[in-house]
């Protein structure tokens, strides 16, 4: 038989400032239709040598804040209705976590709430600023 492992990638922050909730809901809708077995989430990190950095400098795109990115993850987890492994384990995530949905949904949401409540934008931004080029 053939083993098909479909992986979805949620690039948290890619929609830009103020667009995280909309982006998360749209991503959840797509994932809910495709039924991947694993959804991996990485946080967008903009480097000075990137085209996106040039767009920020030109004022044509605004980067989402660090706390906003965690709010986006919370919205995504809240709107996933399929059984799936959800993982945010990459170096671009200041906090790594994973769980099986729907069973671990409340634990994941609680962890995200704690990060949103406890962490400052400056501390999370410092992590991102000091992240070596991926």
Language-model-detected regions and their locations in the chain:
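Short, catalytically relevant binding-site loops at active-site mouths
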Residues: 5-17, 38, 45-49
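Catalytic cores of alpha/beta
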Residues: 7-33
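Auxiliary Fe-S-binding modules of radical SAM enzymes
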Residues: 25-134
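Structural beta-sheet core signal
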Residues: 1-3, 88
